[in-house]
Amino acid sequence: MSDYQLPEVWEAPSQMGGAWGGLNQPTAGARFEQTLPKGDQPFQLYTLPTPNGIKATIMLEELKELGVDAGYDAYRIKIGEGDQFGSDFVAINPNSKIPAMLDQSGDQAIRVFESANILLYLAEKFGKLIPTDPAKRTEVLNWLFWQTGAAPFLGGGFGHFFHYAPEKIEYAINRFAMEAKRQLDLLDKELATKPYIAGDDYTIADIAIWSWYGRLAQDKVWDRAGIFLNVKEYKHLQAWTEKIANRPAVQRGLEVEYKEIDA
């Protein structure tokens, strides 16, 4: 039983503990001056191969597979060292999260942040991997936004308390494992009736969801989390996961060679 007592007004502790405790602060904004490099390709991507980060590289590789001029320079943002709080990065994404992207293909560079928005921006810019039919397009967006709403319970909830927290808290792990299992069961039931998450065609919704839930189904997010959640029992999810994992563009998106920002 915890002896923690709620204060009337919360104040940030001097030491948080855990994997990210030293970086977390209750304020936003740049913490230091830093100039990010820019290459010659149309898209400048500042990211890391996390579940959110790989969405952008997979999407860009899928576009290239479709014959689109979607060349990009990918720069490694070392979030464990705080690169996301540098002034140039914050100018692209004031929320200090990866991935962040600059589209410099036009007269004026356009900043794009939030991984799902990067998917949507690129899909709309090139007219690929999103339907034009209103009903089908809405179904894709249903699932794209489902992922953005559901994944924080998986990552910030289950993943944090299962893998990153400085101590194992039974209530917290049970609470978020329950929700993670519910989400996996939902996807498994949906994929029992159709080849892709939004219907007959592969779309940005599949990229968004696979990057979290497909990787979890492969047990490639947190060590042994897939075993803990018994992901093998979700047969339809597993089949979909394997089908997408075998796509050449997905494989390339996972094997990107990142440039260093301080090289």
Protein language model features and the residues they cover:
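Phosphate-coordinating loops and pocket residues in cytosolic domains that bind phosphorylated ligands
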Residues: 91, 246, 255
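Residue-level recognition of oxygen-bearing side chains
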Residues: 117, 236, 249
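C-terminal helix/juxtamembrane-tail motif
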Residues: 250-263
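GST-like fold's C-terminal all-alpha helical module
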Residues: 2-5, 122, 131, 142-246
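GST-like domain detector, emphasizing the conserved glutathione-binding G-site
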Residues: 1-174, 181
